[in-house]
């Protein structure tokens, strides 16, 4: 999503609509988070769209910033869209809850992962709580609600090994199967 978000006609590739966007802060950096849809709302990186249900069209709900500016929530983490709220780390590591309709920040915490460029948290719903796998190799079980973040448990699973600037990261998403978690870094 380095230059734009586009809606295409699948059979012929015709562009229905396009919204210019800048997701990368530097050459070689782009947002890689997966788009998230709930009902008629589509969240791509830091852009929340209201999709038109009658025709292939959309309008931006938030943020209220000019086209072509850096509009991003997280470079690497896919947000969780739950009810009328969005839960996600920001690119610098702060973890936030946003009102899905307005983008207004309801709360933030700096306790999930380190505050640094390249911060990443993978979110996996698990009943009434969530598993959060951090770029530091920690698995966290937490409750996320519009009123706040509550950490229930934390365990360190593996060392981060992927270098970026002076820091090391564990960016790979975890996999869950048969009550097991599978995680990896560059060495194991």
Residue ranges: model-predicted function:
Residues 1-188:
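Noncatalytic, solvent-exposed loop/strand surfaces
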């Amino acid at each position: 999503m380095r230059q734009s978000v586009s809606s295409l006609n699948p059979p012929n590739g015709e562009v229905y609509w396009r919204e210019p966007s800048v997701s990368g802060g530097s050459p070689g950096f782009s947002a890689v988070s997966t788009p998230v849809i709930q009902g008629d709302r589509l969240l791509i990186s830091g852009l929340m769209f209201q999709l038109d249900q009658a025709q292939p069209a959309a309008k931006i709900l938030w943020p209220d910033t000019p086209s072509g500016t850096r509009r991003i929530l997280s470079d690497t983490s896919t947000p969780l869209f739950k009810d009328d709220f969005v839960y996600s780390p920001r690119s610098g590591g702060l973890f936030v809850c946003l009102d899905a309709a307005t983008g207004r920040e309801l709360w933030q915490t700096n306790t999930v992962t380190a505050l640094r460029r390249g911060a990443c948290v993978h979110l996996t719903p698990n009943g009434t709580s969530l598993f959060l796998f951090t770029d530091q190799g920690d698995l966290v079980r937490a409750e996320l609600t519009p009123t706040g973040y509550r950490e229930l448990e934390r365990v360190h699973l593996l060392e981060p090994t992927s270098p970026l600037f002076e820091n090391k990261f564990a960016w790979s998403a975890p996999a869950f199967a048969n009550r097991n978690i599978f995680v990896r870094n560059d060495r194991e």
